[in-house]
């Protein structure tokens, strides 16, 4: 007969937090190094630890990535096991530390009294600088140069831990106002990185495979095993490439743009002669010069198949979101003139929002329009406008499902020359990617463009007379931004949660403002400008073209004179 004491049939009594603190029977000291025992749930001061007293100087307040057992629960000695903190866990520690400093300065820091309001902190001015200065005190993970680029979207995904200010995207706070509860045993902390319940309840993915017929050989058992559907495995939510139709109609796979890397489908440039040194039958490796290829542009303007966040669902020019804010851009951009596109707000489930506007290709796709210097946006909630994560009042009431929104950008040009005044051609012509790496991916060639957005942000200059204007159901809301940074801007939309919106890129608009051109007309114009940009690149880099010497012809001198004139014009 099973004993009534212990055994499987008896549930363990839930742990309750003790009322005393530390070996010294003192009080909590928020803002200093403290650790909690995973067995008795008692908090201990870093200075009072027996075997690990060095934590008082080497540790940081509000650490959450460790397991500690006190000497009262483990008589032989204290036990300490540190765990590697990821970005979200680091942010919990940093926000708690900075919040404690703010509350202490205001005379409100106490373990007995919980603040009524959230303690908001600036991501740009407080959180990121603190993490940069104390990185290796917070984690053993190697610090990357652009680690903070996607910090805001990362925090937004952990809704049980962080809250964002309604009117300022740069301000974040801890959802837990009682700092005395923060530690490795906090329920929200324990769920960091765990998959949401709705993902856990997804139906297992079954893959239908055709029956394998043939004689019973040694490999038959392996083939039978391959026929069985795979269940229970976690599906990879991220993706590395998108499948789409190329301009020539062929279905291809194209890598997603992400983390300062962008990819452009190419074709052989018919204006560049083949290298006579190349022999397709040679056994040694041959590196194809990238200038032998050119970017293959879409004949029409549409939502880009790869210059978008991977988690967005694209159907034609309709975009549906997933979880936190993420962005999609159009396939063509503008750097001069007055251009216009519209957005139809198709579906707005509860607590979902969108932002629309214009962004440069350097703007992060895992963030919202208006998150940094490279984008300007307008939010459906409250009608707030955003730039550099700073929200300002713009159009009272915002917009909602069923509304038609217009986006206009004006980048002034010289009336006679029809180009921006006092700007070199490389500032308004599309970039020639002939000087970038040429890579092979899924049987196609792509230009791989890698540029540090942080470095480019330092070189931005305002364009006098430029502006962005938004329209609500055909009526102007006024100029939202003036004297914006010069650069190439793309129609952009970012979606929060599962809202759906459609980009209307022309040629039929509900309301085309006077003097503006529909963005659809940019397709033909960019074809010509891209060709000119490539020609200028070839002329300026001619000395690097590695072709063998040829026999001089009578017209060589005339050709040299023409090329010399072109260089002088450049």
Curated annotation (Swiss-Prot):
Name the record gives this protein: Set1/Ash2 histone methyltransferase complex subunit ash-2
Residue stretches making up the B30.2/SPRY domain: 270-468
Organism expressing this protein natively: Caenorhabditis elegans
Keywords tagged on the record: Chromatin regulator, DNA-binding, Metal-binding, Nucleus, Transcription, Transcription regulation, Zinc, Zinc-finger
Complex and partners: Component of the SET2 complex (also known as the SET1/COMPASS complex), which contains at least set-2, swd-2.1, cfp-1, rbbp-5, wdr-5.1, dpy-30 and ash-2. Within the complex, interacts with cfp-1 and wdr-5.1.
Tissue: Expressed in somatic and germline tissues (at protein level).
Domain of life: Eukaryota
Biological role stated in the UniProt entry: Component of the set-2/ash-2 histone methyltransferase (HMT) complex. Required for the di- and trimethylation at 'Lys-4' of histone H3, a mark associated with epigenetic transcriptional activation. Implicated in the epigenetic inheritance of lifespan over several generations. Functions as a transcriptional regulator. Acts in the germline to limit the longevity of the soma, probably by regulating a lipid metabolism pathway that signals from the germline to the intestine, thereby preventing accumulation of mono-unsaturated fatty acids.
Zinc finger regions, PHD-type: 19-76
PANTHER family: SET1/ASH2 HISTONE METHYLTRANSFERASE COMPLEX SUBUNIT ASH2, SET1_ASH2 HISTONE METHYLTRANSFERASE COMPLEX SUBUNIT ASH2
Disruption phenotype: Decreased levels of tri- and dimethylated 'Lys-4' of histone H3 in the somatic cells in embryos and young adult animals. Increased dimethylated 'Lys-4' of histone H3 in primordial germ cells. Decreased dimethylated 'Lys-4' of histone H3 in the distal region of the germline. Reduced fertility. RNAi-mediated knockdown results in the extension of lifespan. Decreased levels of trimethylated 'Lys-4' of histone H3 in L3 stage larvae. Leads to a deregulation of fat metabolism and to an accumulation of mono-unsaturated fatty acids in the intestine.
Alphabetized InterPro entries for the sequence: ASH2, ASH2-like_PHD, ASH2L-like_WH, B30.2/SPRY, B30.2/SPRY_sf, ConA-like_dom_sf, SPRY_dom, Zinc_finger_PHD-type_CS
One Gene Ontology molecular-function label: zinc ion binding
Signal peptide residues on this chain, from the entry's feature table: none
Biological processes annotated in GO: chromatin organization; determination of adult lifespan; programmed cell death
One Gene Ontology cellular component: Set1C/COMPASS complex
Record localization: Nucleus
Disordered, as annotated region: 201-242
Subcellular location, principal: nucleus
